[in-house]
């Protein structure tokens, strides 16, 4: 179901209106409390600037970390307000609490185009419980609602779902709209051939996604630590590589399902092994049927890279979720980097390349190729759930188009 978005609202609709905007500002900090990556803050700028330009009074709501429903001084949004103020080139007022007299006073003092950042909503346990009274208090600060926090859209919380019952209009922000357009579009109406590259260490965390993708894709390429569960299910020796013993039957079923549907399910043909889980471990590259005892696979090998590149060459849409190996160790990053480079090249030839959140995003950024991709998702769990075909509560709650 298509949703109304900020694009549908004019300056006349928004001028002098108090607009509550749920954003995803859950950014990483270093030990000194400085932001180490402001990507999520920058991702919300198009929505915030659009509202400022249309004369709205912008009230931002966000969570930070997991304070478990109580005030945690290390999880205040102070560094976020400072960085946002620098990026916008204007003052951002932060409240002491997300509801209550201080928030009300600061919101009441706003002029058109002003920006207020409410303190961490998760300082209240009612946020994650989606408590109606708490949602009503948040909503009482505003006249309209915009959800731009795709990364939190899979949660039915007070600030993502509850507030929509009290605010009309409730619409998607520009980032949310773009996420839905790309991710939903790739699943519902992709340019074909459609390929998915699924990596990461565990089959268990990607079961739903793998099952859904085998239903939708023409090709599914699997890398990362989860490949060893598939190999063991085939009866191969995997040394001391990571295996989920309770998922061996499932691995067999997934391979059988792909075969029955005529979907090309590709696993690596060679792997880079290490004698220890360490950056400077001894390494060797072997065929998957020649993994010796005492060694563990930490990356896909050069033959597998060629196999995957050939399979992707004619694809018109590619979704990538999860690295091919332990890319944090330079010695075992070749597979992941090769996929990143391949997708960047495909983008240049008109292929729609979607990096579906999580570690793949970090890998693409580490390789300096983020700008070359069609779309980089800001959601981890939300991206996975959308690709699985699940309804995201934060999206479902918005006004229908």
Swiss-Prot record:
<dbReference type="GO" id="GO:0005829">
    <property type="term" value="C:cytosol"/>
</dbReference>
<keyword id="KW-0067">ATP-binding</keyword>
<dbReference type="GO" id="GO:0006096">
    <property type="term" value="P:glycolytic process"/>
</dbReference>
<protein>
    <recommendedName>
        <fullName>Phosphoglycerate kinase</fullName>
        <ecNumber>2.7.2.3</ecNumber>
    </recommendedName>
</protein>
<feature type="binding site">
    <location>
        <begin position="357"/>
        <end position="360"/>
    </location>
    <ligand>
        <name>ATP</name>
    </ligand>
</feature>
<dbReference type="InterPro" id="IPR015824">
    <property type="entry name" value="Phosphoglycerate_kinase_N"/>
</dbReference>
<keyword id="KW-0547">Nucleotide-binding</keyword>
<feature type="binding site">
    <location>
        <position position="40"/>
    </location>
    <ligand>
        <name>substrate</name>
    </ligand>
</feature>
<feature type="binding site">
    <location>
        <position position="297"/>
    </location>
    <ligand>
        <name>ATP</name>
    </ligand>
</feature>
<comment type="similarity">
    <text>Belongs to the phosphoglycerate kinase family.</text>
</comment>
<keyword id="KW-0963">Cytoplasm</keyword>
<feature type="binding site">
    <location>
        <position position="122"/>
    </location>
    <ligand>
        <name>substrate</name>
    </ligand>
</feature>
<keyword id="KW-0418">Kinase</keyword>
<dbReference type="InterPro" id="IPR036043">
    <property type="entry name" value="Phosphoglycerate_kinase_sf"/>
</dbReference>
<feature type="binding site">
    <location>
        <begin position="63"/>
        <end position="66"/>
    </location>
    <ligand>
        <name>substrate</name>
    </ligand>
</feature>
<dbReference type="GO" id="GO:0006094">
    <property type="term" value="P:gluconeogenesis"/>
</dbReference>
<comment type="pathway">
    <text>Carbohydrate degradation; glycolysis; pyruvate from D-glyceraldehyde 3-phosphate: step 2/5.</text>
</comment>
<dbReference type="GO" id="GO:0005524">
    <property type="term" value="F:ATP binding"/>
</dbReference>
<dbReference type="GO" id="GO:0043531">
    <property type="term" value="F:ADP binding"/>
</dbReference>
<dbReference type="Pfam" id="PF00162">
    <property type="entry name" value="PGK"/>
</dbReference>
<comment type="subunit">
    <text>Monomer.</text>
</comment>
<feature type="binding site">
    <location>
        <begin position="24"/>
        <end position="26"/>
    </location>
    <ligand>
        <name>substrate</name>
    </ligand>
</feature>
<feature type="binding site">
    <location>
        <position position="328"/>
    </location>
    <ligand>
        <name>ATP</name>
    </ligand>
</feature>
<keyword id="KW-0324">Glycolysis</keyword>
<dbReference type="InterPro" id="IPR001576">
    <property type="entry name" value="Phosphoglycerate_kinase"/>
</dbReference>
<feature type="binding site">
    <location>
        <position position="206"/>
    </location>
    <ligand>
        <name>ATP</name>
    </ligand>
</feature>
<dbReference type="InterPro" id="IPR015911">
    <property type="entry name" value="Phosphoglycerate_kinase_CS"/>
</dbReference>
<dbReference type="GO" id="GO:0004618">
    <property type="term" value="F:phosphoglycerate kinase activity"/>
</dbReference>
<feature type="binding site">
    <location>
        <position position="155"/>
    </location>
    <ligand>
        <name>substrate</name>
    </ligand>
</feature>
<keyword id="KW-0808">Transferase</keyword>
């Amino acid at each position: 179901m298509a949703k109304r978005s900020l694009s549908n609202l004019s300056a006349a609709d928004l001028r002098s209106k108090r607009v509550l905007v749920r954003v995803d500002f859950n950014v990483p900090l270093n030990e000194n409390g400085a932001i180490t990556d402001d990507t999520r803050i920058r991702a919300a700028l198009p929505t915030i600037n659009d509202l400022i330009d249309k004369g709205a009074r912008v009230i931002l709501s966000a969570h930070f970390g997991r304070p478990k429903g109580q005030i945690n001084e290390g999880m205040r949004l102070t560094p976020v307000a400072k960085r946002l103020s620098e990026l916008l080139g204007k003052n951002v007022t932060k409240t002491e609490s997300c509801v209550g007299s201080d928030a009300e006073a600061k919101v009441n003092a706003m002029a058109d185009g002003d920006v207020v950042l409410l303190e961490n909503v998760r300082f209240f346990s009612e946020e994650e419980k989606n408590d109606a009274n708490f949602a009503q208090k948040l909503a009482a600060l505003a006249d309209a609602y915009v959800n731009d926090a795709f990364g939190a859209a899979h949660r039915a919380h007070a600030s993502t779902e509850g507030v929509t019952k009290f605010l009309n209009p409730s619409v998607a922000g520009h980032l949310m709209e773009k996420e839905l357009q790309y991710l939903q579009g790739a699943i519902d109406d992709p340019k074909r051939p459609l390929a998915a590259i699924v990596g990461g260490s565990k089959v268990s965390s990607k079961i739903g996604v793998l099952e859904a993708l085998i239903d939708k894709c023409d090709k599914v390429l699997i890398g990362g630590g989860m490949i060893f569960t598939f190999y063991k299910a085939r009866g191969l020796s995997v040394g001391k590589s990571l295996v989920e013993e309770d998922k061996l039957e499932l691995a067999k079923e997934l391979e059988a399902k792909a075969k029955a549907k005529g979907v090309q399910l590709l696993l690596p043909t060679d792997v880079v092994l290490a004698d220890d889980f360490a950056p400077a471990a001894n390494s060797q590259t072997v065929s998957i049927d020649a993994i010796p005892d005492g060694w563990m696979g930490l990356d896909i090998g050069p033959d597998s890279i060629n196999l995957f590149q050939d399979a992707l060459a004619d694809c018109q849409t590619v979704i990538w979720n999860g690295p091919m190996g332990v890319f944090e160790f330079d010695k075992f990053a070749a597979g992941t980097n090769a996929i990143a480079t391949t997708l960047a090249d495909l983008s240049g030839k008109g292929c729609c390349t979607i990096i579906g959140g999580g570690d793949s995003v970090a890998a693409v950024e580490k390789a300096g190729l983020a700008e070359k991709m069609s779309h980089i998702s800001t959601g981890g769990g939300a991206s996975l759930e959308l690709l699985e075909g699940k309804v995201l509560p934060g999206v479902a709650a918005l006004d229908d188009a």
